[in-house]
């Protein structure tokens, strides 16, 4: 051909022409109307006309200069719009050379595609070309005008209820039974129809979407997603932390109407709480992390895969929490809808809270409604009722309640909220920022249970029985409060509608946002890390990773807990109380005494059943305690292991118990510097927190009864001779404690609780005790800080009066040995020096 005879200077031009021709061919698109041959022909023709033809009919060859001039064209074609301005100049010029005109296709007959080739919409592992019907439809929701993410939240309460709490007579005809209803679309009494349909439509578009795609988009779209569970068991714990802060620590630091705390860490009363329908237990883990051993929890939840996972409480001591599964106790099934379980749990809680009830109850019940998400409210109605019923059953007067709810469109659900509104001082519906905005979850928060709610509780109990009777039938309880009663309270109704519609609007925007994030995987929420940091700071939660507690040996833990205290102190033995040392118990008012039942030991708790004892001698090791009991980690006590007895003769039962003489560290709290009386009071509180009344198989833990030395005679009243099994029928001296169990006493510990140079006296004119400083001669009725005898002073200065052979402390014992200290000698000395 002619071109092969051209000079070498035309070689670069050839290559350029070839590239242009290839580009034109690749940019031409096959048309559904033409066969491939015509398409190829058109492409070739187009390439020929744009890049210069080799055919001899053209008459002459385009020179390199004319090609370069054409290549410098300023635009695609005259009048091209700016919609192509994002393409660089080279590509625009190439398209111009191929004869591109806006609105027309390439090719001889303009048969090429007219639109720009779209980016791939392929998502995940779907098949090529799969289209999810409904998902790609326009929602016409502007999610971009959502409020700026913030850690600050506002609470809106229902107005205070001025209606009297309904009584049995008034509620006698409130329950309405009718046909079971399984649609939600027409529930427009407490929400606008348009909003209701919109939120249901938005939820429905996700039905066809792969779950993993949904989760990934939700994670990117939610500005609060990175908060997660921090170092807790799950996200539920952080929801509770969130709401506890928002409601001014209403749960972990409840206050009376004057703002005074109802429980204090230094005082004897525990913070009692209940956690129902709450496995695996995130709510409880948060409360116990916040309050430690100053709180005691009771739990009821379904047994099985959704049970409490106490072994996963890494940040709190699960020994302070006691699951109880209703009828059958620890062997029950935990089904809150069974009336017998409700009664059993109520009785158990009241029996173990001095018949007062808990300070607050948390309920977080829910179950999978996969495929029926829009009916979640209807399917969960009995669960919601039973959680409300449990609150009215176990919460004390003035106590609080928090419960997860879902949609609240039906008159049945709104009726339940109305009853809470009547029974509590204040009620609100609240969605914390830790609850994902796209779901229907929110919480009903109730403050201050009123007096006189028993009849409402009984009414809800009867409704639950009716629901159980109608199960698996076509009938259902459709109303618990008549619509005219609810709507007669205009302020309640207005709040309910505002709350529902506001919640719907939030959901609609959040769902539309997730949909947008599914469609565009490049979208992200840029402030997630910043918001997380701000929230944790505000709520008082350390930004730490979740790590399992490290295991350690008892000796290392002991040295960690005593923090450099001289170890020799722990090997001190008590001074024997004899006729020669009797003067040491002066002044009498400085001393307390306790009945001994065995050798004193130190006990350390490393968590659960990892408990060890040590006799105080450096040469001896810590020995694993062979008892079935549990203690929180970082606990150090001074104890005796005592064999307790109950009953006499063949029916007599023996059990080994831990008797606490003094406390050093309680679940990480060092109390050694506090007054002896305060330490004993905290020990009593600690024992209440760790006791497990539902577990009779466990060895009990008790605190020694402490007597004032001047009241020692009270001890002898509780001594009697009893026949001990295995003692050949010979009666033995026994001391009976507060719980009607008795043990064989070995003597009496006498502990000085006032530090030198202070001592105690009794003012006859004021008829009260006072403190006197022997050095400065000062006296005061208030306890001076330096008069408190810390643990090591009490331990070092204690005396022990041994009740061995020759010591007669009960009239039925053998005669007194005249060379030993007698009961009469001690009582006479005390009486003389306590006046």
UniProtKB/Swiss-Prot annotation:
Renumbered ranges of motif Bipartite nuclear localization signal: 2-19
EC number(s) given by UniProt: 2.1.1.57
The name this protein goes by in its record: Cap-specific mRNA (nucleoside-2'-O-)-methyltransferase 1
Pfam families: FtsJ (PF01728), G-patch (PF01585)
Domain spans labelled WW: 752-786
Region annotated Disordered, chain positions: 1-66
GO MF terms, alphabetically ordered: mRNA (nucleoside-2'-O-)-methyltransferase activity; nucleic acid binding
Residues forming coiled coils: none
Entry-annotated residues carrying Phosphoserine: 28, 31, 53, 66, 91
Domain of life: Eukaryota
Disulphide bridges, residue numbers: none
Location of the RrmJ-type SAM-dependent 2'-O-MTase domain: 231-450
The protein's enzyme class: transferase
Residues involved in S-adenosyl-L-methionine binding: 234, 277-283, 335-336
Described function: S-adenosyl-L-methionine-dependent methyltransferase that mediates mRNA cap1 2'-O-ribose methylation to the 5'-cap structure of mRNAs. Methylates the ribose of the first nucleotide of a m(7)GpppG-capped mRNA and small nuclear RNA (snRNA) to produce m(7)GpppRm (cap1). Displays a preference for cap0 transcripts. Cap1 modification is linked to higher levels of translation. May be involved in the interferon response pathway.
Subunit structure, interactors included: Interacts with POLR2A (via C-terminus).
Binding of substrate, residues: 203-207, 218, 374-376, 439
GO cellular component terms, A-Z: cytoplasm; nucleus
Region (Interaction with POLR2A): 727-835
PROSITE patterns referenced in this protein's UniProt entry, alphabetically: G_PATCH (PS50174), SAM_MT_RRMJ (PS51613), WW_DOMAIN_1 (PS01159), WW_DOMAIN_2 (PS50020)
InterPro entries: G_patch_dom (IPR000467), mRNA_Cap_2O-Ribose_MeTrfase (IPR050851), RNA_MeTrfase_FtsJ_dom (IPR002877), RrmJ-type_MeTrfase (IPR025816), SAM-dependent_MTases_sf (IPR029063), WW_dom (IPR001202)
Enzyme active site: 239, 364, 404 (proton acceptor)
Organism classification: Eukaryota, Metazoa, Chordata, Craniata, Vertebrata
Primary localization: nucleus
Gene designation per UniProt: CMTR1
Cell compartments where the protein resides: Nucleus
